[in-house]
Curated annotation (Swiss-Prot):
GO terms for molecular function: orotidine-5'-phosphate decarboxylase activity. The gene is pyrF. Pfam families: OMPdecase. The active site is at residue 62. Belongs to the OMP decarboxylase family. Type 1 subfamily. Keywords: Decarboxylase, Lyase, Pyrimidine biosynthesis. Pathway: Pyrimidine metabolism; UMP biosynthesis via de novo pathway; UMP from orotate: step 2/2. GO terms for biological process: 'de novo' pyrimidine nucleobase biosynthetic process; 'de novo' UMP biosynthetic process. This is Orotidine 5'-phosphate decarboxylase. One of its GO terms (cellular component) is cytosol. Substrate binds at residues 11, 33, 60-69, 123, 185, 194, 214-215. It comes from Bacillus subtilis (strain 168). Signal peptide: none annotated. It comes from the Bacteria. It catalyses: orotidine 5'-phosphate + H(+) = UMP + CO2.
Amino acid sequence: MKNNLPIIALDFASAEETLAFLAPFQQEPLFVKVGMELFYQEGPSIVKQLKERNCELFLDLKLHDIPTTVNKAMKRLASLGVDLVNVHAAGGKKMMQAALEGLEEGTPAGKKRPSLIAVTQLTSTSEQIMKDELLIEKSLIDTVVHYSKQAEESGLDGVVCSVHEAKAIYQAVSPSFLTVTPGIRMSEDAANDQVRVATPAIAREKGSSAIVVGRSITKAEDPVKAYKAVRLEWEGIKS
């Protein structure tokens, strides 16, 4: 990760929608996230188009499979020139290590390996869901911290977690370990389907390394204005 800009979640169905959304930003440097919907619709071409626009790019596919499959997939993703990719920590240490090896093998000579982070628990997951549906008796915070330690031991660069776990994670891992936190909303915005949410200011106070912001920007009447407001709050600058 080259900078600390808010990461904009490009939750659109097509390249056409995505590029139309980005047009008002002109050539402003941006850090964007491409998820499953957009990547599965457009494939590697959307990555190429966004890199041509000079965007830093988080490819959010949350790989979770047997180690060999994840290793081979990461080799392919590394060749695309993305900056940040992820796996599910629940896949275990062997899978995470295989993912890292795949990235290292697939990164073109002379290029920097994409950063690799692991999803701990989705921000839509609550304590109740963990206990009743996933049959996990440990608390959510204990599970997230455990997954974070496993990710660091596997050589990964960080994790995806909610803002509310960031401080506890840093009591268990090194200061350079990344905590990428989705579920970010401005105070006036609805939480929608996410449970563990926070504002950019709270994320900064809790020690998040990076924030991922979707609907507060993409659904705003003026996305550029909304992005600037998020960025100022994230940077601790009063508008």
